[in-house]
Amino acid sequence: MKRALSPLLSIALVIAAGILCAQNPEKDAPYKNPKLPVEERVADLLGRMSPREKAAMLSGAGWMESQPNARLGIPAIKMADGPMGVRNWAGSSAITNAAATAPVLATAFPAGIGMGASWDVELVRREGQVIAQEVKALGRNMILAPTVNINRQPLWGRNFEGYGEDPYLTARMAVAYIQGVQSEKVIPSVKHFAANNQEFERHRIDENIDVRTLHEIYLPAFQAAVQEAGVWAVMNAYNKVNGLWCAQNPFLLSDTLQKRWGFKGFVISDWGSTYSTAATVAAGMHLEMPGGEAMRTWFAKPGTQKDGNGAGWLTAEKVLAAVAGGQLKQEAVDDATRRILRVMFTAGLFDNARTGGGEVDTPEQRGVARTASTESIVLLKNAGGALPLDASKIRSVAVIGPSAAIARTGGGGSSLVRPKYSVTALDGIKEAAGARVQVGYALGVSMQGDDASEVSPQARAHLSNQAVELARRSDAAIIVVGYSSKLESEGFDRPSMDLPTGQDELIEAVAAANQNTIVVIVAGAPVTMTKWIGRVAAVVEAWYGGQEAGHAIGDVLFGAQNPSGRLPVTFPKQWSDSPAYGHYPGENLHVAYEEGVYVGYRGFDKRNVEPLFPFGHGLSYTKFDYSGLKITPAKVAAGKQVVVTARVRNSGSRAGVEVVQLYVHDVRSSVDRPVQELKGFRRVALEPGEARNVSFTLDQSALSFYSSAKDEWVAEPGAFEVWIGASSRDIRLKGTFALTR
């Protein structure tokens, strides 16, 4: 006969069992076990969630956080704006053009266009890593970056955020940035999917783009982000593409992103870009932002949304109602929840949810920012070797202009970072010039939006006269002009390519007073220079260079650094030369991309239009020679690779970096193709007299076009030419090979 356990012993065993369960929660809840595969953890957690808990995952809890779940221990995804650094996330200040008011300080890197001008993949990867480190240090776990939209035309207000006009260059930079961010277990969200190429009516505009143009120009960076970098999140755009909002566009989200490319992460809406419940979830959009009170407060503001309410469609109540009413399948809700959880597990949010307490803006991070600022600078013109300035031979320098004594670290909108410090061009020039050189300063003209912009005509004339007189008595005049975060920003487009508020006239006046006038441009896109380009000695494109821009400008002007930047966009002589001219901003809320694949240099080549400065252009303080082009094999079978090798030699007297560019020309095609397309590039650092072999590998994708008829990429047999050069208009070597069947 068995003896019954005593009451005290029974209680003790129950307590012991409870302690063991508390010490080993993974036993009863496998999703908490970090040793299990991600998919097993996702499946276990998803199976424990109620329909309401699943539905709640599809909308945010506030302005910059997803919905947490206390019962199951699901943490919130905590977001921060990017891509040039960690942007403020506090309330509605996140979408103003002013610097963030909350005390969120982080390293400010150059704008994306400047990073594109570096043509330095490893540098961009390191930038992504540093930004991710600061995301974690500031208590967040997701960065809304990178921006990979193509610079279709020079007036777009967010040209500065992207990497330029070329899909190949943009894709290389996107992959590197994402790899850097994800290496730190921070969630990036590549944006804006797809074709966000103008701010004018961005909430309502319908963009009509043929399928070939989409696949060849506007989608490659996103495809590379998914298939090469394995990006964890994608942000949809505000606009419509071919009649459907991007947030509920099955062609983009379901057919292309998820089915064709195999995307396993989640799609997050741009803030206020959703217009339906069932159609949005069914199309493949998974997390609506913002949510909660932040959503209601923001979208209650007059004029915030001009075409219905762009948020509040994926609340738990609406999602459950759509499922109950038969408009939405539960499987679609499960898929959205599964995707969000998959990313959260992959990023370690369940296992190491604690963030904050790390360092921001460390000496090492500042060093990366300074390198980035330096490499972003492009020397556009250098007549007679006007640069670099020799501090041992000049006694005085005039520094003039509305952007000389103000650090314009970035363009406006959600990307503008508030750094702990910033270096102005004036301070950087003073430091680089040294104590022996007298550096004078004059404003010259005030820029709209600056404190002194509202001045009388008499005061404006006085400012200009002061600048001219300073230039006249100086050995060299450096005039720093351009745009600002209040004039070039998310939310609106530029009215023209012209420099604003009398800056052209100031340059002309200063150049007339000093033949050694150097123009430094601080902007995010090309500007018109035809009035004065022939009258100045040198032109430097500094973009928005981040917090270290001043140091970088000074170092380049005085020769401590040899400029190595190359243009990631074509600089037209005037706006009317742009391929998109006449097809922007559209009519009746429709814009037709009638230029097709002929964006940027492709369009200039097609129409044989001479640009002011071509894509890929950038001068150096040394010279480079090209020789020894080899292409093997001479005949390549479909699916095989071609190896291209060339020799580059520094034939000048100082060390420098050449950016060797490879373009492919299809000799004969069944469809009209661009004259040339960038398919490879290498940064090569060379000492004086040093030479190196540079190699490229071309696969079938480098030879292909997108066939609208076949709905697939096609590489046709025949002859192809390889063009190697220093820019799209400075080709040094040419060779031919054949693609066989």
Task: Provide a role label for each language-model segment.
Residues M1-L9:
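Bacterial N-terminal signal peptides that target proteins for export
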Residues L9-G18:
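Bacterial N-terminal signal peptides
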Residues G18-F705, E712-V714, A719-R729:
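Glycoside hydrolase catalytic-domain context in secreted enzymes
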Residues D730-R741:
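Short beta-strand elements
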